[in-house]
Amino acid sequence: MSVKPIDNYITNSVRLFEVNPSQTLFSISYKPPTQKTDTKVSFRTHNSHLSLNYKFTTNKSKDVSRLLSALGPRGVSITPGKIEKIAQSKKKNNKIKESSKKIKGKSIQDIVGLATLIVNTDVEKSDPAAKKTATEPKQKANAVQNNNGNSAASKKKKNKNKGKKKR
């Protein structure tokens, strides 16, 4: 299993931002298509103080989505490549020999989102289910009002549109 270029770009950009956040610039540029296959989105991380520049260009929406989520507060998960897995397994073997206990290691590495580094606080996960429960009583109350005397106008609209076809 080899490391993908997008994973290299994400890890290098996050490390660069962790080292020197005030001098690091992120730029996203979009090249509109002259033909359908010529669409390009390029992501660039640049630090002139350390003279580092990372660039990733793609035309796939999946890659763009992954990079934008890496910029967000939750970050992304990256599977390590062959070299990193070998290094991790050597470390595990040394630990097992020393402690004579089996240690289960994760093969997936979580990368912190760049927005978390900018804010410098932990980001809490929000539950979308909590938002749905708050809106349900309002919808039920509106339905009760419509079933009572306020529904005369809505019945006229329904009867008026009864014979028409929907498009």
From Swiss-Prot:
Q: How does it assemble?
A: Fungal signal recognition particle (SRP) complex consists of a 7S RNA molecule (scR1) and at least six protein subunits: SRP72, SRP68, SRP54, SEC65, SRP21 and SRP14. At least SRP14, SRP21, SRP68 and SRP72 are proposed to get assembled together with scR1 RNA as a pre-SRP complex in the nucleolus which is exported to the cytoplasm.
Q: Where is the composition biased (Basic residues)?
A: 154-167
One term under GO cellular component: nucleus
One GO BP on record is: SRP-dependent cotranslational protein targeting to membrane
TM segment ranges: none
Compositional bias (Basic and acidic residues) spans? 123-139
The family database entries (Pfam families) matched by this protein are listed as: SRP9-21
Q: Which gene encodes it?
A: SRP21
Additional info? Present with 3400 molecules/cell in log phase SD medium.
Q: What is the name of this protein?
A: Signal recognition particle subunit SRP21
Q: Which InterPro entries match?
A: SRP9-like (IPR039914), SRP9_dom (IPR039432)
> Which superkingdom, per the lineage?
Eukaryota
Q: Does the record carry Nucleus as a key word?
A: yes
Any GO MF annotation of the entry: RNA binding
